[in-house]
């Protein structure tokens, strides 16, 4: 398995473009999966510079509906064949906002403080573009290609990983409520070395999500994690607990990035031996050896 980061906040090599977003190109056998598409079009230009032909993409998956993860698809769509499978999760078209007051929701003041963050397109847009392969999934776990899975329907995180109160969504009655990110999904690749997990932002809590992955693949060890862990706005205690989780796990590569935030990245760099600096241009492949251990370290 090979992955290439096409779009991220940071760049690892001169000549590539950064943006606040995330896009990862995954190669596994004959599968060419684009996991998220960034905010604008950095993933397109970076792919060209990295020698990746996005017209060869065999499937697309969106981690959630925020524009920094699927906004770039508005420019990418014309490159793809109309029947390419495109996977979102149920709830993808629920409108989302960020409340800049960073306070618990107060309905009467929303209109003055909210920024619309997703989705950047409506359901009709896919059909107007002739993209007949678009699907909204409702599965806990679905295999979309050999060894490649999408997982959704995560349990609500505990109080230590609660969704930030500034994340709100449109409720069933049209009123705004705390966002539960029902559309969030992660990609899991089952390799001989263990499970490789790709996250978008892990709004439902990175520890909670990885624990769910372990429960759904009970015989397989976690080997690597790439993507956002949503440790912003920074909470030093939450960051420390998250770093401890990774440090005491058997995860051999922690390519946390994007919404992990500057403080989170610094703590990971200082305390997690498995941490791998991740940005646009990163190319990573699974090692050839197989791992048999599973679970977590005792200390």
Model-predicted segments: where are they?
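Conserved beta-strand hairpin/beta-sheet module of binuclear metal-dependent hydrolase folds
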Residues: 2-50, 180, 184-199
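Active-site metal-binding loops of divalent metal-dependent hydrolases
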Residues: 8-10, 37-40, 65, 90-92, ...
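Pre-active-site segment of Zn-dependent metallo-hydrolases
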Residues: 16-17, 31-59, 102, 168, ...
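Structural motif
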Residues: 31-33, 59, 148, 194-196, ...
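Active-site metal-binding motif and surrounding structural segment of the metallo-beta-lactamase
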Residues: 42-93, 217-224, 250-253
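Cap/insert and terminal regions of metallo-dependent hydrolase folds
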Residues: 65-69, 85, 175-186, 190-279
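Metallo-beta-lactamase
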Residues: 93-185, 277-287
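Binuclear metal-dependent phosphoesterase catalytic core
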Residues: 265-266, 274-299
């Amino acid at each position: 398995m090979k992955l290439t980061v096409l779009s991220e906040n940071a760049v690892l090599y001169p000549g590539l473009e950064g943006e606040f977003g995330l896009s990862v190109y995954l190669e596994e056998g004959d599968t060419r999966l684009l996991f998220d598409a960034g905010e604008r079009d950095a993933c397109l230009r970076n792919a060209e510079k990295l020698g990746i032909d996005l017209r060869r993409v065999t499937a697309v998956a969106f981690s959630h509906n925020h524009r920094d993860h699927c906004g770039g698809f508005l420019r990418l769509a014309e490159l793809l064949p109309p029947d390419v499978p495109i996977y979102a999760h149920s709830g993808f078209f629920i409108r989302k906002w960020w409340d800049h007051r960073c306070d618990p929701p107060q309905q009467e003041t929303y209109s003055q403080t909210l920024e619309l963050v997703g989705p950047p397109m409506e359901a009709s847009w896919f059909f107007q573009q002739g993209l007949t392969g678009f699907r909204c999934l409702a599965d806990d776990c679905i295999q979309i290609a050999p060894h490649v899975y999408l997982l959704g329907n995560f349990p609500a995180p505990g109080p230590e990983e609660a969704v930030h109160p500034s994340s709100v969504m449109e409720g069933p009655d049209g009123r705004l409520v705390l966002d539960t990110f029902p559309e969030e999904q992660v990609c899991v690749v089952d390799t001989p070395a263990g499970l490789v997990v790709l996250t978008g932002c892990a709004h439902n809590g990175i520890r909670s999500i990885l624990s769910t992955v372990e429960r759904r693949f009970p015989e397989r060890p976690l080997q690597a994690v790439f993507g956002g862990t949503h440790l912003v706005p920074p909470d030093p205690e939450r960051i420390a607990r998250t770093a401890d989780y990774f440090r005491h796990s058997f995860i051999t590569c922690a390519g946390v990035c994007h919404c992990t935030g500057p403080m989170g990245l610094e703590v990971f760099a200082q305390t997690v031996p498995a941490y791998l600096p991740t940005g646009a241009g990163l190319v990573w492949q699974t090692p050839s050896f197989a791992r048999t251990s599973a679970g977590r370290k005792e200390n």
